[in-house]
Regions:
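Short, glycine/acidic-rich hinge or "gate" loops at secondary-structure transitions
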Residues: 1-6
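Sequence/fold signature of self-assembling virion shell proteins
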Residues: 8-51, 62-67, 71-189
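Extracellular/periplasmic catalytic domains that process cell-envelope and extracellular macromolecules
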Residues: 58-60
């Protein structure tokens, strides 16, 4: 999914190689990404989180989804307008791993977010719109549980001391419309 062709570079960078340590993700970068997705007619992935009666809570508009690293989260928390997930008015539609929202993007943090080697470590923040990608079932065994009981290893386990249990899974995802997703490449603090 990170291989999408719609790329935005932080600050004044024009390529990944020209990103410097000071070119961190910012609210302006997020707003520029949202503007690009709107211009590409990308749909939003979430519904509005309606306001509630709780103290110090905020409604959240319908949003695109951003996938970020923990290092990117550190920088985004300093941006004006950042709403941590704890301040959402209604937490029933919070996604697993969701950490907050900024402008029209709700962010999900993962330790598997993409990084690229360059003059500095470049982080790739994905901003996804509706129908950017699709997933499909794999025919046959998409999930297979494998159990080898004690003694099944023959002469390599003559005392029947080892048994194993494991699984194999197949998963297919494909980019459907390059214009409905965007990767922001940037440095982090």
């Amino acid at each position: 999914i990170v291989a999408g062709t719609t790329v935005q570079y932080a600050s004044s960078a024009t390529t990944r190689a020209t990103i410097t340590a000071s070119m961190k993700i910012s609210r302006d970068e997020i707003r520029e990404a949202v503007r690009t997705l709107h211009g590409n007619n990308a749909g939003k992935l979430t519904r509005m989180v309606n306001p509630g009666t709780g103290f110090n809570t905020s409604p959240i508009s319908a949003c695109f989804i951003g996938i970020i690293s923990h290092n990117t989260l550190f920088d985004l928390k300093d941006e004006v307008g950042w709403i941590p997930v704890e301040e959402y008015a209604n937490k029933s539609d919070v996604m697993e791993g969701e950490v907050g929202a900024l402008d029209e993007v709700r962010f999900v943090m993962t330790t598997n977010a993409s990084t690229f080697a360059s003059t500095v470590t470049v982080h790739g923040t994905l901003i996804l719109g509706s129908d950017f990608y699709g997933i499909s079932r794999v025919s046959g065994e998409a999930l297979r549980n494998i159990i080898k009981p004690l003694g099944s290893a023959g002469t390599s386990d003559p005392l029947d001391q080892n048994s194993t249990s494991g699984w194999k899974a197949s998963f297919v995802a494909k980019i459907l419309n390059e214009n409905f997703g965007l990767r922001i490449e940037h440095a982090v603090s």
